[in-house]
Amino acid sequence: MNVLFAGGGTGGHLYPAIAMAGELRKLVPDVVISFVGTTGGIEATEVPRLGYRLHLIPVRGLKRGRALADIVANIGVIADFVAALGRAAALIAREAPDVVVGTGGFVSAPLLLAAQLMRKKTLIQEQNAFPGVTTKLLAALASEVHLSFDDARRFIRNKKRLFVTGNPARSFALPQQVAAREYFALSEERPTLLVFGGSRGARSINNAVLEGVDLITASANLVWQTGALDFERIKSKMQPSPYIWVAPYIEEMGVAYGAADLVLCRAGASSLAELTNLGKPSVLVPYPYATGDHQRHNARALVTGGAAMLVEDDRLGQQASIKNILELLHDKERLKRMGAASRKLAYPDSAHQLALRIISLAKKN
C-alpha cells in the first residue's frame, strides 16, 4: 500500500498527517508513506527528522487584500499554482499512490486536485470548525471528507462521504496532579492555571497575564509558556514568586496538563483536540486574524458544548476578564462539569479511525 500525504506549512496541518502515518505503520508495517510540502513550512525539517520521505513543491497562498499590490501578487500565485499542479501530477504518476491524503496548507490544493483529475482515491482531513478553502472547493470530488467538528457539516455542500472523526492529536500519559505540581515546584493546595499561546507564544495573552500576574498568584499557581519571542521581556518584568513556573516552551506538556485545573490558550484545532481528549476545561481566546476567523468557530463549538469559556482577544487585558477567569478557576463544581463536557467532545482514537478509512480506500483500487 502506498499513501501520499499533502499538507503542512504549520504544525496544525502537519501533525494530524504525522499521527495518521504513525497509525498506518502500526496497522500495515510494509506501507509506503511519503509527504509533500514546501521549503518554508515546518514539514521541511520535521518530516525528514521522523524518517519519512519528503517531496517539495513550490506553491504560495492567495493574498486576501484588495489593494493593487495584492491583485498583482495573486497573478503570480495563480501562475505558480498551475505549475504546482503540473508538478503534482508528475509526482503522482511517478509515485503511484493508492490514496492521497490532504490535511491543509497551500500544498494540499494542487496535490488533491491533481489526484482527483487522475482518478486517484483522495481523503481530506479538515481540522477546523470553519473549513478551509481547499476543503470547501474540493470536497465534492473527494472520496471521503473527514471533519473534526460536527458543526463544520453545514459548510460542506456535498454531504455524501462526509464523516466526523475528530482531529488527531498528541497523546499524553497524565501524572497525578500532586506529582505534576511537584515537578513545577508549585503549591499542592492552590488551583493551577496553565497558560500557553502555541510554541511561538501569543503577545496579547502574555500581556494580559503579565498585567494580572499579582492577582493570579495571590490565590493560584501559574504554569506559563510564553513562547521564545516573548520570554526575556516577560522574565525581566516579573517579580520572583514561588507560585509561578515560566518558560519559553514546555517540553513536558503532559505534566503541565496534569498540573492544570484550567487552561488559558488560543483556539487552534490541535490544542482543542488535546484539551477534549484530556477532559480539560478551558478559557479560549481566538486569534482575531485567523483565516476565515476559524478559531472563533472552533471556540464556539466547545463553548456550546459546555466545555469552555470564550474571551475576546481585545478584552482579555481588562481586569474584569482576569477576575472572571480566577472566579472560574476557584469554582470546583463548575470546572468538574466543564471537564466532563470537554471529554464528551473528544475523539481520542481519531488517528486510528482515519488510518482504517485510508486502508479501506486503498483496498477499493
From Swiss-Prot:
Topology within the bilayer: Peripheral membrane protein
At which positions is UDP-N-acetyl-alpha-D-glucosamine bound?
Answer: T10, G11, G12, N128, R170, S199, I250, Q295
Q: In which pathway does it act?
A: Cell wall biogenesis; peptidoglycan biosynthesis
UniProt KW Membrane keyword? yes
Record's keyword terms, sorted: Cell cycle, Cell division, Cell inner membrane, Cell membrane, Cell shape, Cell wall biogenesis/degradation, Glycosyltransferase, Membrane, Peptidoglycan synthesis, Transferase
- Enumerate the GO terms in the molecular function aspect: UDP-N-acetyl-D-glucosamine:N-acetylmuramoyl-L-alanyl-D-glutamyl-meso-2,6-diaminopimelyl-D-alanyl-D-alanine-diphosphoundecaprenol 4-beta-N-acetylglucosaminlytransferase activity; undecaprenyldiphospho-muramoylpentapeptide beta-N-acetylglucosaminyltransferase activity
What sort of enzyme, by top EC class, is this? transferase
Q: Which residues cross the membrane?
A: none
Tell me which Gene3D superfamilies the record gives. Answer: Glycogen Phosphorylase B
* Catalysis performed (reactions): di-trans,octa-cis-undecaprenyl diphospho-N-acetyl-alpha-D-muramoyl-L-alanyl-D-glutamyl-meso-2,6-diaminopimeloyl-D-alanyl-D-alanine + UDP-N-acetyl-alpha-D-glucosamine = di-trans,octa-cis-undecaprenyl diphospho-[N-acetyl-alpha-D-glucosaminyl-(1->4)]-N-acetyl-alpha-D-muramoyl-L-alanyl-D-glutamyl-meso-2,6-diaminopimeloyl-D-alanyl-D-alanine + UDP + H(+)
Cell compartments where the protein resides: Cell inner membrane
Which Gene Ontology terms describe the biological processes this protein takes part in?
carbohydrate metabolic process; cell division; cell wall organization; lipid glycosylation; peptidoglycan biosynthetic process; regulation of cell shape
InterPro entries linked: GlcNAc_MurG (IPR006009), Glyco_trans_28_C (IPR007235), GlycoTrans_28_N (IPR004276)
Tell me where it mainly resides.
membrane
Q: What is its EC number?
A: 2.4.1.227
* Protein purpose: Cell wall formation. Catalyzes the transfer of a GlcNAc subunit on undecaprenyl-pyrophosphoryl-MurNAc-pentapeptide (lipid intermediate I) to form undecaprenyl-pyrophosphoryl-MurNAc-(pentapeptide)GlcNAc (lipid intermediate II).
The identity of this protein, by name, is UDP-N-acetylglucosamine--N-acetylmuramyl-(pentapeptide) pyrophosphoryl-undecaprenol N-acetylglucosamine transferase
Q: Which organism is it from?
A: Pelodictyon phaeoclathratiforme (strain DSM 5477 / BU-1)
